[in-house]
Amino acid sequence: MDGTGGSDILRAFDTMDLNWKKLHYAFLSHEHTDHFLGMIWVIRTIAELLELEEYEGDFYLYGNDVVLGKVLHVCRMILKKQSQAFLETRIKFVLVKDHERKHILNYDFTFFDIGSTKAKQYGFLMEYDNGKKLVFAGDEPLKENGKKYSKNVDWLLSEAFCLFDEELKFHAYQYQHQTVKEASMIAQDLKVKNLLIWHTEDQTGKKRKERYTEEAKQFYKGNVWVPEDGEVFNM
């Protein structure tokens, strides 16, 4: 789900001992560099494994028409010819539309346009086979098109760029982000069971989890999760 802002994703895979050969599905929400550029490295890595005949099956990247078009354009400009041969053959670009449903990895996904005015961006509802539901809301506050999929879900992955009292410092509103306070109030209104806060500023350091959780619990009665990079937990 998104690719970070660049080659950091390679280090993350290495640090967490993740196997590229087992990665077959990815989703890219939008074109902004902190989400987009790492996906180019993902595609390059998969293409090199394919060239070496060390990757079984195909790789599928899901996204809206705008972001997929730009990924494909960049890949055609900068990847070597041997890698480009796998684009749209073994490396597949799967277009999804607003409210479209797809069955992926034994899960049911419903994709939706988050209504961003900065760049076309999609989120999704993921329904587990045990009935649980997860919503990835994109990196802006939930609007009505996303809220209707988020009522009573088990997990809401919501951006919150900073604490409410530090908005003037980090300018969350200027960039169409929200604070922990707003994210928590929305989650409470939607009766979400678990709120996972991501896409945060990175200056708070080791106290971020504690401080963000403390603010969230003032407005939200469910479980609050503020993961650190590389943290793994059971959803």
Predicted regions located by residue number:
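Cap/insert and terminal regions of metallo-dependent hydrolase folds
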Residues: 141-230
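P-loop/Walker A phosphate-binding loop and immediately adjacent motor/lid segment at beta-alpha junctions
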Residues: 42-60, 120-127, 168-196
